[in-house]
Amino acid sequence: MQPRFLVLLAAYNGMKWIAEQVESILSQRNVSVTLLISVDTSTDGTEQWVADLAARDPRVIALPFGEKFGGAARNFFRLIKDAPLSDFDYFALADQDDVWNGDKFTRAVDVINAQRVDGYSSNVNAFWPDGTQRIITKSQPQVSYDFLFEAAGPGCTYVFTRTLFTALQENVVSRFGELQAVTLHDWYFYAFSRANGYRWHIDDVPGMQYRQHSNNQVGVNRGVKAFKARLAQVFDGWYLNQAARIAQLVGMSDQPFVRDWINLGRVQLVRLALNSARCRRRPRDKFVFAGLCLVLALVKHKK
């Protein structure tokens, strides 16, 4: 029997690219695919397109329309909460605007079985309207607490075993109200998995073409403008406050390492800087993380 996949796709004003994305999902080789779509209230006809697709293709299920989520994370939390568990071996996430390689799922299954893991993600091949392409590498070796401070790559590369997805769904259902304050679903899903002892593998082989455009909610940090925007999120407290919130929601707030920094005081930020090697995967990010923590500690001291 072919592996059975349920793909959770979050859409919003997606008419420009959703057809190409859906075609690449439904064309996955040597697996059985069912596609579950949730549409954030749109103005470009996305709901009608999805409804028509679901009416003519039994592999496609549309969740009821009419909800305004205001962001991809809330849409994905809704998808996780409402996803049917029966009849599926694996569960995957999808954006509305990428293009998947035909062997994306067969490779994921092979890696999951070979590595004996419950969570899978991968590098991606990012591409821009001007024809530029670049491999985005997220497969640096995992460290003790990277999951509290970053995702395992783009969420559209994530694949969960039934065992992991069942546990994740139970968590999302029980924490649904609190999760509305979490901005990045892929970060949270990775954090939940690692915090609860599930093994995860980040594949160095890209399985998809990751489209970059002006409407990306979260994309590749490319250029000075994007870097400044990310830096502003760090200095206004969003980043570490999200880390603290995620640590609490995945049940790690009482862990000694987390207790040392979760209140984000000046001394705690210095401690966090000294532990940067355990907080980020990429060597450069370890140094940047330490520097940012020290700068934030200095800012708090001046206040």
Model-found features: residue ranges?
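Short beta-strand/loop segment that forms part of the nucleotide-sugar
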Residues: 9, 33-41, 63-65
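Short, well-formed alpha-helical segments that are part of the catalytic scaffolds
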Residues: 14-27, 49
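A conserved acidic beta->alpha catalytic loop
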Residues: 39-49, 69
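Glycine-rich, basic loop-to-helix element that forms the pyrophosphate-binding segment
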Residues: 66-85
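Short beta-strand-to-loop acidic/aromatic patch adjacent to the donor-nucleotide binding site
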Residues: 88-97
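Conserved donor NDP-sugar-binding/catalytic core segment of glycosyltransferases
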Residues: 99, 103-134
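Acidic donor-binding loop at a coil-to-helix junction in glycosyltransferase catalytic cores
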Residues: 178-191
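Catalytic donor-sugar/metal-binding loop of nucleotide-sugar-dependent glycosyltransferases
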Residues: 191-209
